[in-house]
Protein backbone atom coordinates (compact mmCIF):
# COMPACT_ATOMS: atom_id res chain seq x y z
CA UNK A 1 0.00 0.00 0.00
CA UNK A 2 1.12 3.53 -0.64
CA UNK A 3 2.48 5.70 2.18
CA UNK A 4 0.14 8.53 1.18
CA UNK A 5 -3.00 6.67 2.23
CA UNK A 6 -3.68 5.69 5.85
CA UNK A 7 -4.20 2.08 6.82
CA UNK A 8 -7.86 1.27 7.41
CA UNK A 9 -7.16 -1.80 9.50
CA UNK A 10 -7.62 -1.48 13.28
CA UNK A 11 -4.44 -0.87 15.27
CA UNK A 12 -2.97 -3.64 17.33
CA UNK A 13 -3.65 -3.03 21.01
CA UNK A 14 -0.73 -2.70 23.36
CA UNK A 15 -0.58 -5.85 25.45
CA UNK A 16 0.74 -3.95 28.49
CA UNK A 17 -2.29 -1.65 28.44
CA UNK A 18 -4.98 -4.22 27.75
CA UNK A 19 -4.04 -7.42 29.53
CA UNK A 20 -7.35 -9.11 30.26
CA UNK A 21 -6.04 -12.54 31.13
CA UNK A 22 -3.90 -11.71 34.17
CA UNK A 23 -4.57 -13.85 37.23
CA UNK A 24 -6.28 -12.42 40.30
CA UNK A 25 -4.43 -12.10 43.61
CA UNK A 26 -5.42 -14.97 45.84
CA UNK A 27 -5.92 -14.77 49.61
CA UNK A 28 -2.56 -16.32 50.50
CA UNK A 29 -0.63 -13.74 48.49
CA UNK A 30 -2.74 -10.93 49.93
CA UNK A 31 -2.09 -12.14 53.49
CA UNK A 32 1.63 -12.30 52.74
CA UNK A 33 1.62 -8.70 51.45
CA UNK A 34 -0.28 -7.52 54.53
CA UNK A 35 2.22 -9.28 56.80
CA UNK A 36 5.14 -7.67 54.97
CA UNK A 37 3.49 -4.28 55.35
CA UNK A 38 2.96 -4.82 59.10
CA UNK A 39 6.59 -5.87 59.61
CA UNK A 40 7.69 -2.81 57.63
CA UNK A 41 5.59 -0.53 59.85
CA UNK A 42 6.95 -2.23 62.98
CA UNK A 43 10.53 -1.77 61.76
CA UNK A 44 9.85 1.96 61.32
CA UNK A 45 8.57 2.17 64.91
CA UNK A 46 11.58 0.34 66.33
CA UNK A 47 14.18 2.11 64.20
CA UNK A 48 16.53 4.29 66.30
CA UNK A 49 14.38 3.69 69.36
CA UNK A 50 17.45 3.59 71.62
CA UNK A 51 18.78 7.05 70.66
CA UNK A 52 18.78 9.81 73.28
CA UNK A 53 16.53 12.72 72.37
CA UNK A 54 17.98 16.17 71.90
CA UNK A 55 17.21 18.55 74.76
CA UNK A 56 16.65 17.84 78.42
CA UNK A 57 17.50 14.37 79.65
CA UNK A 58 14.69 12.13 80.82
CA UNK A 59 16.16 11.77 84.31
CA UNK A 60 16.02 15.50 85.07
CA UNK A 61 13.44 16.32 87.72
CA UNK A 62 11.36 19.42 87.33
CA UNK A 63 10.74 21.88 90.12
CA UNK A 64 6.95 21.74 90.38
CA UNK A 65 6.68 24.85 92.57
CA UNK A 66 8.27 27.07 89.92
CA UNK A 67 5.96 25.69 87.25
CA UNK A 68 2.88 26.34 89.40
CA UNK A 69 4.01 29.92 90.14
CA UNK A 70 4.55 30.56 86.44
CA UNK A 71 1.11 29.18 85.64
CA UNK A 72 -0.52 31.36 88.33
CA UNK A 73 1.16 34.50 86.93
CA UNK A 74 0.07 33.62 83.40
CA UNK A 75 -3.49 32.98 84.58
CA UNK A 76 -3.69 36.34 86.38
CA UNK A 77 -2.38 38.17 83.29
CA UNK A 78 -4.91 36.40 81.07
CA UNK A 79 -7.73 37.20 83.52
CA UNK A 80 -6.90 40.92 83.56
CA UNK A 81 -6.77 40.98 79.74
CA UNK A 82 -10.11 39.16 79.59
CA UNK A 83 -11.65 41.69 82.00
CA UNK A 84 -10.46 44.60 79.84
CA UNK A 85 -11.85 42.93 76.72
CA UNK A 86 -15.20 42.35 78.41
CA UNK A 87 -15.37 46.00 79.54
CA UNK A 88 -14.68 47.14 75.97
CA UNK A 89 -17.39 44.81 74.66
CA UNK A 90 -19.86 46.12 77.26
CA UNK A 91 -19.13 49.71 76.22
CA UNK A 92 -19.72 48.81 72.58
CA UNK A 93 -22.97 47.01 73.39
CA UNK A 94 -24.29 49.97 75.38
CA UNK A 95 -23.56 52.28 72.45
CA UNK A 96 -25.30 49.90 70.04
CA UNK A 97 -28.39 49.76 72.26
CA UNK A 98 -28.67 53.54 72.74
CA UNK A 99 -26.83 55.29 69.90
CA UNK A 100 -28.68 58.61 70.46
CA UNK A 101 -27.38 58.93 74.02
CA UNK A 102 -23.74 59.12 72.91
CA UNK A 103 -21.81 62.34 72.57
CA UNK A 104 -22.43 63.21 68.94
CA UNK A 105 -21.99 66.76 67.73
CA UNK A 106 -24.77 67.72 65.37
CA UNK A 107 -24.02 70.09 62.50
CA UNK A 108 -26.42 72.89 61.63
CA UNK A 109 -26.88 72.45 57.89
CA UNK A 110 -29.12 75.46 57.34
CA UNK A 111 -26.84 78.15 58.75
CA UNK A 112 -28.79 80.27 61.19
CA UNK A 113 -28.25 83.88 59.99
CA UNK A 114 -26.66 83.36 56.56
CA UNK A 115 -28.38 83.99 53.28
CA UNK A 116 -29.49 80.77 51.54
CA UNK A 117 -28.30 81.97 48.13
CA UNK A 118 -24.80 82.84 49.30
CA UNK A 119 -23.47 79.28 49.00
CA UNK A 120 -24.16 79.32 45.24
CA UNK A 121 -21.73 82.16 44.54
Swiss-Prot record:
Keywords: Cell cycle, Cell division, Mitosis. This is Anaphase-promoting complex subunit 15. Residues 52-121 are annotated as: Disordered. The keyword Nucleus does not apply. GO terms for cellular component: anaphase-promoting complex. Belongs to the APC15 family. The APC/C is composed of at least 12 subunits. GO terms for biological process: anaphase-promoting complex-dependent catabolic process; cell division; protein branched polyubiquitination; protein K11-linked ubiquitination; protein K48-linked ubiquitination; regulation of mitotic cell cycle spindle assembly checkpoint. It comes from Danio rerio (Zebrafish). It holds the Pfam family ANAPC15. Component of the anaphase promoting complex/cyclosome (APC/C), a cell cycle-regulated E3 ubiquitin ligase that controls progression through mitosis and the G1 phase of the cell cycle. The APC/C complex catalyzes assembly of branched 'Lys-11'-/'Lys-48'-linked branched ubiquitin chains on target proteins. Transmembrane segments: none annotated. Pathway: Protein modification; protein ubiquitination.
Amino acid sequence: MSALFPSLFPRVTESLWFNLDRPCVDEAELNQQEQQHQTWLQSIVEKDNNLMPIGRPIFETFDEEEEEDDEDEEDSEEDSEDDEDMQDMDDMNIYNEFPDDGEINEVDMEGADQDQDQWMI
